[in-house]
Amino acid sequence: MLLIPAIDLKDGRCVRLKQGDMNVSTTFGEDPVAMARRWLDAGARRLHLVDLNGAFAGKPVNEPAIKAILKEVGDEIPVQLGGGIRDLDTIERYLDDGLSYVIIGTAAVKNPGFLRDACTAFGGHIIVGLDAKDGKVATDGWSKLTGHEVVDLAKKFEDYGVEGVIYTDIGRDGMLSGINIDATVKLAQALTIPVIASGGLSDIADIERLCAVEGEGIEGVICGRAIYTGDLDFAAAQARADALNGDA
């Protein structure tokens, strides 16, 4: 079970939002590169970056900070990025800079042809990010709820050749209310590609619950607010996951 620290970038700083609200953010660091190094030193085996401004603007905004992070740690661990990625040129540029995985969310839902083209051009590097509330997919930085069922869309995108799915339960994100295990398992069981859980991770018990269902196809979990507030000790949590899964 991969525990993947999230570094959410807003105006060049590391922040956390509550339920995707750009007006309700807490700054946890002024130096994104130092934050990336901090998580690497704590034992992270992958990093999750989000260009928050980019997600709302529909184009890259925090690219300088992202490039600096890739320069610092991109040769050491895989880095994945979401937010504001709407065209193939942007994907190519980020991959050339050392990014391992591009996360396509809103653009995949609104323009499935773009996702298909991205999978064709950059096979092995495309992850789809599906954000859902009560099983329905949301787009545009979670501001718009669609009528799409998350399982149906994920199966369609699996056929396109995406590398995996990051599933975020919007109702829980940033609330430290616990991962929606049932919904995540339901999605993983419907797919053959890996699912990464996201939204609401609160404590070591969540990690233990996820490890218990890892065999259903859950590859990892995005760690956000809990590792910044101290509710979850990242290094201890990864060690616990490794011990439970026999990786230690």
UniProtKB/Swiss-Prot annotation:
**One Pfam family it belongs to:** His_biosynth
Protein family according to the UniProt entry: Belongs to the HisA/HisF family.
The Enzyme Commission number assigned here is 5.3.1.16
Protein's name in the database: 1-(5-phosphoribosyl)-5-[(5-phosphoribosylamino)methylideneamino] imidazole-4-carboxamide isomerase
Species assigned in the record = Methylibium petroleiphilum (strain ATCC BAA-1232 / LMG 22953 / PM1)
Gene Ontology process terms (BP) = L-histidine biosynthetic process; L-tryptophan biosynthetic process
Catalytic reaction list: 1-(5-phospho-beta-D-ribosyl)-5-[(5-phospho-beta-D-ribosylamino)methylideneamino]imidazole-4-carboxamide = 5-[(5-phospho-1-deoxy-D-ribulos-1-ylimino)methylamino]-1-(5-phospho-beta-D-ribosyl)imidazole-4-carboxamide
- Entry's Gene3D superfamilies? Aldolase class I
Q: HAMAP family annotated for this entry?
A: HisA
Broad EC category: isomerase
Q: Which residues form the active site?
A: D8 (proton acceptor), D131 (proton donor)
- Any one GO molecular function term: 1-(5-phosphoribosyl)-5-[(5-phosphoribosylamino)methylideneamino]imidazole-4-carboxamide isomerase activity
The terms describing its cellular component in GO are: cytoplasm
